[in-house]
Amino acid sequence: MFPQSRHPTPHQAAGQPFKFTIPESLDRIKEEFQFLQAQYHSLKLECEKLASEKTEMQRHYVMYYEMSYGLNIEMHKQTEIAKRLNTICAQVIPFLSQEHQQQVAQAVERAKQVTMAELNAIIGQQQLQAQHLSHGHGPPVPLTPHPSGLQPPGIPPLGGSAGLLALSSALSGQSHLAIKDDKKHHDAEHHRDREPGTSNSLLVPDSLRGTDKRRNGPEFSNDIKKRKVDDKDSSHYDSDGDKSDDNLVVDVSNEDPSSPRASPAHSPRENGIDKNRLLKKDASSSPASTASSASSTSLKSKEMSLHEKASTPVLKSSTPTPRSDMPTPGTSATPGLRPGLGKPPAIDPLVNQAAAGLRTPLAVPGPYPAPFGMVPHAGMNGELTSPGAAYASLHNMSPQMSAAAAAAAVVAYGRSPMVGFDPPPHMRVPTIPPNLAGIPGGKPAYSFHVTADGQMQPVPFPPDALIGPGIPRHARQINTLNHGEVVCAVTISNPTRHVYTGGKGCVKVWDISHPGNKSPVSQLDCLNRDNYIRSCKLLPDGCTLIVGGEASTLSIWDLAAPTPRIKAELTSSAPACYALAISPDSKVCFSCCSDGNIAVWDLHNQTLVRQFQGHTDGASCIDISNDGTKLWTGGLDNTVRSWDLREGRQLQQHDFTSQIFSLGYCPTGEWLAVGMESSNVEVLHVNKPDKYQLHLHESCVLSLKFAYCGKWFVSTGKDNLLNAWRTPYGASIFQSKESSSVLSCDISVDDKYIVTGSGDKKATVYEVIY
């Protein structure tokens, strides 16, 4: 078939110089395979060797990074210590005699003069120590010596800190570590140290200069832009004045809340002094104003005039909006300073500053006292108050904080720290004695521990103040229920499906399981048409609702009927009921009467069985212990009283200097939170004289409710704020700003939802985020 192909002779003669046979080809292929196999084996050995070297280099990388990081930490720690000691010296020297002042000043100046020879010795010692440390980790990468006159590339001369930084740069440079965030931080930090006159200034320490210099940096300009945006967001409340409804008169017996006072805005998660913002003398105050109820409330005259504004509530989970009437820190003006309730002995501001300056962070884990970029002091109240406080107290984060530290905070705590956030310059002046509020350049605290003898001390928050199971992160508004009248009472069903809102002459029922529903599922007309509902309570079975308000009768509604209906009415001698409470067994109802009595009703027989008499003015709020044995009531006579329900007698009485508008008893026992007309929230221990006093509200506290887990509670006020607090010391968990006075609130049994009723004729539903 293939005669030409089977005739090999011409091909061999013409094109092939050797004989082509199959065995030879196989031998040649075998030789080539063996050669490739040997080459593969050689490459494999080389690859394994490179992998081993790579592992070794990674070990060196980690070792030198840790050394460099540790040196950076130590350098900043020593720098901060030097600044604080310099500040203390500057404060103490004026107390010396003139002769000693000069001697001490000269000694301080001599101590600042570090010669190049001393720096060379320091650098040499540090390098030798680093080499000794590296011997235990395999052959060290050789360290390049840095003469005293030469600086590492890209880093400006750093004065007295050159030795440490030169060493850390040598370590990182030889192992090819380009840690840009660290270098930026060093440049920013030491640029301030290099300012002319800084090292020779005794009376104006470096820590006081840093903030003025930072004002020219990009972080400060960004902060100003952020503030302007916040100001625009907040100023639209004021522009809604033309759209506000007519004044609504609410008949509320014997109430007399004062009008909102000038109160400050500050970072609620911090409770201490902000050393970074000492003496910002040139800081310009950007105009900002916040909406608060435009009218005053009068319970004494039986009228509560609410000038409300129709605007969407704005949730601010961190910082209240700044007020334009607040003084800039560093100035002597202190408008809005209110006299304190207690009068503790005067505290020497010099001693205070020294003590505050020498404090260390309360909650910084890890091998070093504070991460780089942080100001390592806890202030008077422990600014490092949250999980993220290990790297930044969330609101007091240094603008030079590196990305590595931020990432570490996220990994460790699951929350992204608010990098670059700077609190507004308008500092709050809370209701505290001037000697506590007036710490020079200090950021006012808002949580104070008050001892039995009236001593007030800012509270250092523990490291788990804002973390842990059952502690929310923030709250998100998910629904608005347009009731149509001022909502003075709200309650949530169990399980969470229906919300009941009490307004003028009726209670409306809303189904919140379908967020799209914008209209109530039913309306319960009760009391008189023009009388406001002041309280409504569901029995645990969810089938009975009790309603009280500006009438002498309480309405009992049967919700299990095909159409809700009134199944009974309870009539008392008092003209109004301000608050209701139900016993855990659902057998008894307690009503706070405008005449000061506490009426006890038998719900089964629908009769009045007892009255607790003691309040000399209207009883405004009430709560009952979980075991049903103890009742707590607050009154317009400035007292909080506890009652033994088994024996029918008064147990305790707490006297205050302000009317009591709201209270709540912690479900887990021991703590009672009280909301005041004076804008304070006080948390009392039921068996001890000690208490906590909280100062974030700017006007009277109108309602208060504990979460069912007992770990936190919320309060609302005439200042349009909803505040969430940690039990009992009052670390601020989150804060929401609504568009009008927030008159009432409730928390669902599963602690997942909060409902508030406000003066702009609506209720707001929040989802609690954990």
Swiss-Prot record:
Per UniProt, the ranges with Basic and acidic residues bias are 178-196, 209-246, 267-283, 300-310
User: Which keywords appear in this protein's UniProt record, sorted alphabetically?
Assistant: Nucleus, Phosphoprotein, Repeat, Repressor, Transcription, Transcription regulation, Ubl conjugation, WD repeat, Wnt signaling pathway
Q: Residues annotated as region CcN domain?
A: 200-268
Q: Where do the segments described as Q domain lie?
A: 1-131
Q: Which residues carry this modification: Phosphoserine?
A: 239, 259, 263, 267, 286
Instruction: State if Ubl conjugation is listed as a keyword.
Output: yes
Tissue expression? In all tissues examined, mostly in brain, liver and muscle.
Alphabetical list of SUPFAM superfamilies matching this protein = WD40 repeat-like (SSF50978)
Task: Give the residue ranges for region: Disordered.
Answer: 128-157, 176-348
Role noted for this protein:
Transcriptional corepressor that binds to a number of transcription factors. Inhibits NF-kappa-B-regulated gene expression. Inhibits the transcriptional activation mediated by FOXA2, and by CTNNB1 and TCF family members in Wnt signaling. Enhances FOXG1/BF-1- and HES1-mediated transcriptional repression. The effects of full-length TLE family members may be modulated by association with dominant-negative AES. Unusual function as coactivator for ESRRG.
Family statement drawn from the similarity comment of this UniProt entry: Belongs to the WD repeat Groucho/TLE family.
Q: What is this protein called?
A: Transducin-like enhancer protein 1
The scientific name of the source species is Homo sapiens (Human)
Supply the gene name.
TLE1
